[in-house]
């Protein structure tokens, strides 16, 4: 089941470093260096093989394209890792900008600055074949009965509550790595992810993973 509520993937800007056609000299954390953050880990298809420096994957390629427009050569780009929660919390950051499929919300816009969206995606239900074999179906009535998990810091939580309203409150985790680990441990039945990430997780990360 795909939930066609659009989740905007955006660049999170932590400083005033990115400005179209503007000189970046003196506007980055380290002079002459553009520091870009990604997730830990960074998932396919956004970053291939968790290696953003390879320039392979949608967000890795976007990052180097932005760097080139700002006048930074590839060897002047450095990468750091942040959790989703660290990226959207108030306070000093260790990056110039961050690409991690952020959804834009009014609450987040009060804390950080976003670029225009560079990608929009449907949301998908990630589960396992065992849950489907036990009778789970792609209907709201069936989805309500499942045990859900979610990253507490993502828009998956309000989407679950508003669109599905599960019979049991979703179990909340620190990040999506913990969510998929909980699914593998059979602590939860299902979780919401953007469609590209859900396809990757079902094929590579979660044994016998499936989309419902």
Sequence positions of predicted segments:
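N-terminal signal peptide c-region/cleavage motif recognized by signal peptidases
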Residues: 14-19
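Extracytoplasmic small-molecule ligand-binding "clamshell" domains
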Residues: 22-101, 110
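Ligand-binding cleft/hinge of the Venus flytrap
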Residues: 49-52, 63-75, 140-142, 155-174, ...
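Alpha-to-beta junction loops
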Residues: 72-74, 92-100, 146, 184-197, ...
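Short helix-initiation/N-cap motifs at beta->coil->alpha
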Residues: 77-89, 134-136, 171-185
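A ligand-binding cleft/hinge motif common to bilobed small-molecule-binding domains
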Residues: 85-86, 102-111, 161-162, 189-212
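Short Pro/Gly-enriched coil loops immediately N-terminal to beta-strands
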Residues: 113-127, 163
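Flexible hinge/capping segments at coil-to-helix
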Residues: 129-147
């Amino acid at each position: 089941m795909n939930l066609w509520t659009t989740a905007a993937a955006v660049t999170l800007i932590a400083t005033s470093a990115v400005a179209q056609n503007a000189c970046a000299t003196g506007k980055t954390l380290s002079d002459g260096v553009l520091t870009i953050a990604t997730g830990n880990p960074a998932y396919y298809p956004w970053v291939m093989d968790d290696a953003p420096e390879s320039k392979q994957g949608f967000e890795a390629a976007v990052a180097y394209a932005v760097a080139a427009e700002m006048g930074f050569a590839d060897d002047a780009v450095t990468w750091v890792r942040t959790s989703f929660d660290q990226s959207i919390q108030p306070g000093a950051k260790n990056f110039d900008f961050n690409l991690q499929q952020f959804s834009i919300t009014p609450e987040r816009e009060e804390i950080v600055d976003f670029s225009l969206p560079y990608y929009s995606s449907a949301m998908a239900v990630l589960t396992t074949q065992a849950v489907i074999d036990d009778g789970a179906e792609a209907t709201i009535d069936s989805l309500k009965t499942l045990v859900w998990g979610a990253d507490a810091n993502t828009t998956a939580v309000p989407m679950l509550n508003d669109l599905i309203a599960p019979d049991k409150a979703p179990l909340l985790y620190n990040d999506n790595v913990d969510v998929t680990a909980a699914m593998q441990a059979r602590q939860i039945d299902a979780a919401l992810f953007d469609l590209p990430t859900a396809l990757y997780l079902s094929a590579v990360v979660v044994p016998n993973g499936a989309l419902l």
